[in-house]
Amino acid sequence: MPNNKEDIKGLTPATQEVFEQVSQLECIKDLFLCGGTGQSLQMDHRLSEDLDFELLGLRKTRPKLDFGAILGEIKAKFPEAKEEILGEDHFLVFVNDGRVKLSFYRPENPVKTMKVGWRYNNLRTPTLQELLGMKIYTICLRTVFRDYYDIYCLLDAQCDLDEAISYASYLSRHTIRSKTMYARLLSPQLFCKDEDFQRMSPRIDITAEEIRDYIKKTMEKDNRQ
């Protein structure tokens, strides 16, 4: 775990500028920082800019996101903050002249208690293993190259694919079949690089086809084919 802000890696310059203040917010204590930033803070495999907070594993003590309290505290630190409400349990807040997006989301269904993978001030992330399951679930909903790249980096860090598939199935409430997830993982044509990805300064230069080949070898090694 980092001891000071100089040890924080994996953020774009705009996000780095506000990260210390965001990490000190009281309103994020019950939330988890998920997504690519939750991974980049632990791996520094690329830069990430969005801060995606999720309310996971809580229902009885705090059934909904407290929009008023969250926005009030953020605006106390960032008076220029602008909000965008996407739904009762999902809203965005833009800070640092709109260059940094904070999202706050509560999944419709409760998520079992998460383990803490990384912590700094009031901010915490899931473990890399849990993030892999989340990423596999995500690519069943959208196809963006950075997610494919993130999955490769997590597998290369020895996260378990079987366990991640099981967790992704759990997140989908078992509506997405394991066979569908494996097929998506072996479909590099769905994941095309774009200019935004190159702006994230990936530490590894790899193509979608090379990622597919790596995943295929991982599956073969575990007797999946």
List the predicted regions and their residue ranges.
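Compositionally biased terminal segments of proteins
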Residues: 1-225
